[in-house]
């Protein structure tokens, strides 16, 4: 990805947040906000038309929620990376959002300190989770890993009999 021309589509229905995101991103010389939209259907259409490198996507959108919009964007613009920004702190919602193939989930109240690191991480092909949700994901991953190890242990012991 050419660092001098990273193209971003901002999808946010609340105008003050949309303006904040666009302004913060435009201050970065390597980022170019190529579009701003305020609803889910419009997001899908613009993503198909513009093929952005990054879609900054709210969840609570009119006409089509952000999670469904992300699923559709993945189909019409598969190379676009998606970073969710939401007021919702629910780990279940974050998991559902990430299950769409999105690269990150950022809680809006954390954007002051995390917006640019999140964008950078996502553009580098990494995953990003807001610090306020990270604990949940660490516990879930640890439990999942422990369960997998236990399952393999049972299989190995069973095979030894």
Briefly describe each language-model feature range.
Residues 14-18, 129, 158:
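Short acidic/polar segment at the start of the alpha1 helix of CheY-like receiver
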Residues 39-42, 65-68:
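Acidic catalytic/metal-coordinating carboxylates
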Residues 30-38, 46:
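Short hydrophobic/Thr-rich beta-strand motif most characteristic of the beta2 strand and flanking loop
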Residues 94-99, 104, 109-150, 157:
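Short, flexible helix-to-coil linker/hinge segments that flank and couple to helix-turn-helix
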Residues 67-79:
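Short amphipathic alpha-helix used as the core "switch/output" element in two-component signaling
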Residues 89-92:
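Conserved phosphotransfer active-site motifs of two-component signaling proteins
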Residues 12, 153:
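Conserved acidic carboxylate
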């Amino acid at each position: 990805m050419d660092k001098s021309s990273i193209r971003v589509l901002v999808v946010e229905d609340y105008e003050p947040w949309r303006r904040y995101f666009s302004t913060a991103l435009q201050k970065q010389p390597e980022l170019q906000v190529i579009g701003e939209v305020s609803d889910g259907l419009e997001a899908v259409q613009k993503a198909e038309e513009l093929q952005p490198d990054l879609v900054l996507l709210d969840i609570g959108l009119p006409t089509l929620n952000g999670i469904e919009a992300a699923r559709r964007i993945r189909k019409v613009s598969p190379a676009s990376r998606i970073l969710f920004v939401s007021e919702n702190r629910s780990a279940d919602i974050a998991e559902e959002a990430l299950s769409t193939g999105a690269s990150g989930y950022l809680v809006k109240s954390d954007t002051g300190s995390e917006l640019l690191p999140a964008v950078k991480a996502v553009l580098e092909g990494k995953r990003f989770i807001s610090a306020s949700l990270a604990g949940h994901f660490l516990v879930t991953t640890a439990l999942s890993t422990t369960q997998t190890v236990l399952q393999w242990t049972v299989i190995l012991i069973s095979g030894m009999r």
